[in-house]
Amino acid sequence: MSETVVESFTLDHTKVKAPYVRVIETQSGPNGGTITNYDLRLTQPNETAIETGGLHTLEHLFAGLVRDEIDGIIDMSPFGCRTGFHVISWVNYDSETLAKVFKKVLEKIASDDITEVPAAEIESCGNYKDHSLHSAKEWAKLILAQGISSDAFERHVV
């Protein structure tokens, strides 16, 4: 077994109050450069998980829509537990700023303006058949109804 301490394994998942954005950590590289890893938690851990089609579609939608709103996003990867995403950025945003961005992006996803899943073709997606725009829109509406907090442990809805 590894002796490396993985931050997400030390987080008490029974204490957090989703949906929220929190800073996991900021790291400086050995040759310079700094990245920040965020926890974008969309559903309450161990209570609800987003099915793969909806989560996969949110991933594709976030990829472009979030980058349209802010600079420095390196990656947004879904958690294996399907409750949210890691968000990796070159820019060290505070959690309130990112929570506001994701609120705006989820509002776009929930709207009638989004009618297709970007890059959901065999050439551009490794599992192109596993998408559900309907599910992504329903999750966006549910998350917005609950409100996105800028704090993982106390509700500070943006």
From Swiss-Prot:
Q: Which reaction does it catalyse?
A: S-(5-deoxy-D-ribos-5-yl)-L-homocysteine = (S)-4,5-dihydroxypentane-2,3-dione + L-homocysteine
One GO BP: quorum sensing
Source domain of life is Bacteria
Question: EC annotation?
Answer: 4.4.1.21
How is the cofactor bound, as the UniProt entry phrases it?
Binds 1 Fe cation per subunit.
Residues binding Fe cation are 56, 60, 125
Q: Report whether Iron shows up as a keyword of the record.
A: yes
Question: Sorted alphabetically, which keywords does the UniProt record give?
Answer: Autoinducer synthesis, Iron, Lyase, Metal-binding, Quorum sensing
Task: Extract the HAMAP family matched here.
Answer: LuxS
Q: What is this protein called?
A: S-ribosylhomocysteine lyase
Q: Which organism is it from?
A: Leuconostoc citreum (strain KM20)
User: Its gene?
Assistant: luxS
